[in-house]
Amino acid sequence: MAKHGADEPSSRSGSPDREGRASEDRSLLHQRLAVRELIDTEVSYLHMLQLCASDIRSRLQQLPQGDLDVLFSNIDDIIKVNSRFLHDLQETASKEEEQVQLVGNIFLEFQEELEQVYKVYCASYDQALLLVDTYRKEPELQRHIQGIVEAVVPQAGSSGLSFLLVIPLQRITRYPLLLQKILENTVPDASAYPVLQRAVSALQDVNTNINEYKMRKEVASKYTKVEQLTLRERLARINTHTLSKKTTRLSQLLKQEAGLIPRTEDKEFDDLEERFQWVSLCVTELKNNVAAYLDNLQAFLYFRPHEYNLDIPEGPAVQYCNLARDLHLEAFLKFKQRLEGLVWQPLCSLAKALLGPQNLIKKRLDKLLDFERVEEKLLEVGSVTYQEEAARHTYQALNSLLVAELPQFNQLVMQWLGQIMCTFVTLQRDLAKQVLQRAEGSMAQLPHHHVPEPAFRKLVEDALGRTSNQLRSFQETFEKVQPPPTTQPLLPGSERQVQALLSRYGPGKLYQVTSNISGTGTLDLTLPRGQIVAILQNKDTKGNSGRWLVDTGGHRGYVPAGKLQLYHVVPSAEELRRQAGLNKDPRCLTPEPSPALVPSIPTMNQVIAAYPFVARSSHEVSLQAGQPVTILEAQDKKGNPEWSLVEVNGQRGYVPSGFLARARSPVLWGWSLPS
């Protein structure tokens, strides 16, 4: 009895220990089952992804490639990440004691990669659903898609594509639950417990970040669309709310410019925007240069010298024509096609990809003004309306998205530009190689193929030099040998205009247009044949002596020098006698007459006024055509021979030297003093 009484307390104390061990065993069993569930479901999940990426996507080739890219998004990247993730999970099966801790470490290791790939897929999920709804409106297409899905994944049922597309979203949200289940069956004092806690928290953060990213993309998607609206459509969108919003923003901006309120500074974003604008400028410049290159290439291909008949039956010219024909029909056309497909089209796509970020940056500035106004009100009042809070969140979402993605975008654009430039250089190198290969056969038949390259270069330079000298001599000959001047009749009603030009510039500056002139530049004149002009300068601003600056009496501009000839306006003796008389009729200017017959009576030289001149100051004297004058000095006080000091009717003054002429007049019989 005593012995039995001694054993009874020990049996009661052993019962709790057995219950504790049994509880630990149950927790360990549940823990292992949770780990097994994680691995098994990961295997099934990865298999389903592979079916979508391989079997289903390959059978939906009748859909546009753009639709397939939206439907399956970056599913290939998800498969790559989850394949490595599953491999590491399966490796832990051989280490049962450390398996739970290893699982937690694996989740921590893949945290960033999982977030990067799944946030892209989740952000495009709504667009994929819109496409699925569009397909449902086309019964024949919907039946075709449904048949493919049911053949590959029978358990999809009537949901079809929607059942498959939602699987990645369900999986990323289930990871924290699976980890939480493992954590609940882990004793707190175990070494794996804190690791699992960090893993659960990390996966919850991943889902939170994905939701925030998705929200930012939804906000940004409203402003990245480039709409081509007409003026009427833009005006139709204007309402009182729009006017009020834009007026408030303008007021906020003016206050900042005036220094009344501070401007929000964001050095990080400003640096990223500056970098983006520089990258955009590089893309634009390269696109313009490639466009000009393609235009020049097209002009080069339009010129086909091999199609011209040179009337040369044989020799190097025929060989060159054969080579040129071969290059034009094959090498150059293929080069142009490759250039358009591998350089021009990617460059246009790159330029188009810049439009979305550009619109987003512009919209961020508008939202920044709204944000600053709301912040001011929040400091003053302490509360804001729901719409103001939404505007505040919109700016924060846009700013966070740009700061997060602009660095990657700028880097990708620069890499794309580098690849385009490398492709362009490679195409040029391939073209040069093809031309050399095709020319080798023809070069062997040319007369100087055995000459070394330096000597051949010298030979070509000498030949080109001789040809250039010949062309230059021909040009000089044609410039020197001009047709004899012909007298062009004055245009009707131009006498007064000619008189004005004479009184202003003198006869030595007057020229007549020999043929119609059609101006092509902004400063070129269009003049009819026979027009009288005054030369202002015998060259243009670039020093080209082939273009003269002239004055028509109303307009000034440039005309070709080769279409002008000096206009001689010396009046005849009969006209001089008539002008010297009492006849006050208007005087007509005529070209220089042929030499008069020798008079039968003695004559003497007399200086007369060839043209009328009106004095413009007290230092000048007026003249009448045919009026005799006395030259006192053949130059002015500065020695300028263009002005002469004369005496007329007892008055002295300066007149243009070009307005004076010597005329022969009969002398009276008798003695005369020598002049």
Swiss-Prot record:
Disulfide bonds: none
Keywords: Guanine-nucleotide releasing factor, Repeat, SH3 domain
Pfam families in the cross-refs: RhoGEF, SH3_1, SH3_2
Entry function: May act as a guanine nucleotide exchange factor (GEF).
Keyword ATP-binding set for record: no
Gene encoding the protein: ARHGEF37
Domain SH3: 506-569, 602-665
GO molecular function, one term: guanyl-nucleotide exchange factor activity
Protein name: Rho guanine nucleotide exchange factor 37
Family annotation (InterPro entries): AH/BAR_dom_sf, ARHGEF37_SH3_2, ARHGEF37_SH3_C1, BAR_dom, DBL_dom_sf, DH_dom, Dynamin-Rho_GEF, SH3-like_dom_sf
Segments for region (Disordered): 1-26
Chain ranges of the DH domain: 30-213
Occurrences of domain BAR (ranges): 254-455
GO CC terms of this entry: cytoplasm
